[in-house]
Amino acid sequence: MAQIPPSLQDMVNRFNQAQAQLQSVLLRKQQYEAELKEVDKAISEIEKLSPDAKIFKNVGNFLVPQTRDAALQELKERKELLELHVKTLSRQETMLREQLDKLRDEINKELARLKGGEAAKGGG
């Protein structure tokens, strides 16, 4: 093959873009899942404490007192938000994987077509 047709180059470019998007989605999803584990662990530990236990929240360079219930409420809200992010990113991951599969098939078909017609077309 002397030269890649513009249509094939466009497919390859779209494939590479989708692949980069997938990597970004997977990285963000992994970060949210790691934070979700930390939040779950914190909830579990705080639930073991008595209702009047002293809890401190890190705010910048300061530790601020907080009630057990307020801490639990805040963590549960954060957990809900993180779960929503993970769910959204999982959907994006699925869509991108499907898009990549479709583009891979299109690229392979185009390559096979070009390879088969190379002799008849004179290479391009």
From Swiss-Prot:
> Which GO terms label this protein's molecular function in UniProt?
protein-folding chaperone binding; unfolded protein binding
Q: Which GO terms describe its biological process?
A: chaperone-mediated protein complex assembly; protein folding
* UniProt keyword list: Chaperone, Cytoplasm
Tell me where in or outside the cell this protein is found: Cytoplasm
InterPro entries, A to Z? PFD_beta-like, PfdB, Prefoldin
Q: Which GO terms describe its cellular component?
A: cytoplasm; prefoldin complex
Q: Which cysteines are joined by disulfide bonds?
A: none
Function as written in the Swiss-Prot or TrEMBL entry: Molecular chaperone capable of stabilizing a range of proteins. Seems to fulfill an ATP-independent, HSP70-like function in archaeal de novo protein folding.
Cross-referenced NCBIfam families, in alphabetical order? gimC_beta
Q: What is stated as this protein's family in its record? A: Belongs to the prefoldin subunit beta family.
Q: How does it assemble?
A: Heterohexamer of two alpha and four beta subunits.
Quote the protein name from its UniProt record. Answer: Prefoldin subunit beta
Q: Which organism is it from?
A: Pyrobaculum arsenaticum (strain DSM 13514 / JCM 11321 / PZ6)
